């Protein structure tokens, strides 16, 4: 699947599959493991799906190739779990997959929806219906999630990566504002400054944009915004 120009799992994803399983027989070569991981991550991101990959174990062949039993679980470009290779015992890996998040990402991705046309919809795909709720009833156990959700998903842990991410955000805003000013022919900007982080960032973006367009900084006008918050003891609705 992963080694083909157009992976068959792509067609399954377009037809609605959200979890893709790949039972593979990928032999081990120097540096192939890292490349295999990148293929799994890329396909899960391209298909906006969860991709579960399981390769043959060390006892698979007596020929001149070696298998490592590599197992990976990825979700939309992120690696959720991976096994140790070259294990001589059976091992199981598992991960919590956010299906609702995958559904939402597919809904907002216009390119993904555009791929679904009559030719793809007519492909022979075997569909097996089941209900997760019914499976939970059979299990008779309370499901405890092992996945930890990052409360700050847009803030990298690495300080160097944080600086790079912030610079990218800043440059995107500058480029967007510069394009708008050039398109409209406007050479002056007015900013409502409240003293908070948002207005401070807006001021910095305007300063950099005027510098980029070779316009004088005096073209920035500031408007002081005051917000008065009073305690409400009684409220009357008309």
Pin down the residues of each PLM region:
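ATP-dependent adenylation/nucleotidyltransferase module used to activate substrates
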Residues: 1, 161-238
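CN hydrolase (nitrilase-like) catalytic-core segments centered on the catalytic cysteine
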Residues: 3-93
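Short acidic (Asp/Glu) and glycine-rich catalytic loops that position anionic groups and cofactors
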Residues: 20-23, 150-155, 185-186, 219
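Short acidic, glycine/serine/threonine-rich loops at helix termini
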Residues: 31-35, 62-67, 84, 106-108, ...
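Generic secondary-structure signature for well-ordered alpha-helical cores
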Residues: 45, 49, 82-85, 107, ...
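Structural beta-strand/beta-sheet cores of well-ordered domains, especially the beta-sheet scaffolds
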Residues: 47-49, 67-71, 75, 90-95, ...
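Flexible inter-domain linker/hinge segments
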Residues: 90-181
């Amino acid at each position: 699947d992963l080694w083909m120009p157009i992976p068959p799992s792509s067609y399954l994803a377009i037809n609605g599959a959200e979890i893709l399983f790949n039972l593979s027989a990928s032999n081990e070569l120097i540096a192939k493991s890292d490349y295999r991981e990148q293929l799994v991550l890329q396909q899960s991101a391209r298909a906006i799906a969860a991709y579960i990959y399981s390769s043959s174990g060390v006892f698979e062949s007596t020929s001149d190739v070696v298998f490592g039993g590599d197992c990976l679980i990825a979700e939309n470009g992120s690696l959720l779990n991976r096994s140790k290779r070259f294990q001589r015992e059976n091992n199981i890996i598992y991960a919590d997959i956010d299906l609702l998040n995958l559904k939402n990402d597919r809904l907002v991705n216009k390119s993904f929806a555009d791929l679904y046309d009559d030719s793809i919809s007519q492909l022979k795909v075997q569909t097996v219906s089941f209900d997760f709720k019914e499976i939970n009833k059979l299990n008779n156990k309370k499901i405890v999630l092992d996945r930890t959700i990052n409360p700050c998903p847009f803030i990298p842990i690495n300080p160097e990566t944080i600086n790079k991410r912030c610079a990218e955000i800043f440059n995107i805003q500058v480029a967007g504002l510069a394009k708008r000013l050039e398109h409209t022919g406007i050479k002056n900007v007015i900013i409502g400054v409240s003293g908070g982080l948002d207005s401070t960032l807006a001021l910095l973006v305007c300063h950099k944009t005027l510098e980029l367009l070779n316009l004088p900084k005096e073209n920035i006008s500031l408007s002081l915004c005051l917000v008065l918050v009073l305690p409400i003891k009684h409220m009357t609705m008309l």
